[in-house]
Amino acid sequence: AITVHLVDGDGCTITVAPKGFGSENMSRIQMLKPADGVEGFKKFVIETVKLAGSNPCPPIVLGVGVGGSFDKVAYLAKKALLRPLDVPNPDPYYADLEKELLTAINELGIGPQGFGGRTTCLGLAIEQMPTHVAGLPVAVNVSCHVTRRASAAL
């Protein structure tokens, strides 16, 4: 997919993020109810990893989107995979949620290649946007341990 963002200036930045489909097949989207709240959100993210098991070649990297609409939340999850692992969400609430989910996922014990252990997920990034009061869209984009990206400015 090609996504274009128009910004001020006279330059262009191109980012490429090749991704295997084994991990893509483990990605999920869910239109939660607002009453599900943050607990429902966390449950869905953790359940996604649990259901994936060894299929996405863990340790994995997760991009999580929340908010927007059906199409936007999937975009947010994919966009989250572009954020470097050592850069938390700028919103302290979501940064704390990233840490909490990473800990919970690593406590699942799936481990590298599904052989067990404490390193199931190398990193997790959440991207969010406002949504309609009647919905709580959530998407989890799963990527394997060789998550990679490259950017060039022209």
Language-model features: where?
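Non-transmembrane, aqueous-exposed alpha-helical and coiled segments at domain scale
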Residues: 1, 5-64, 69-154
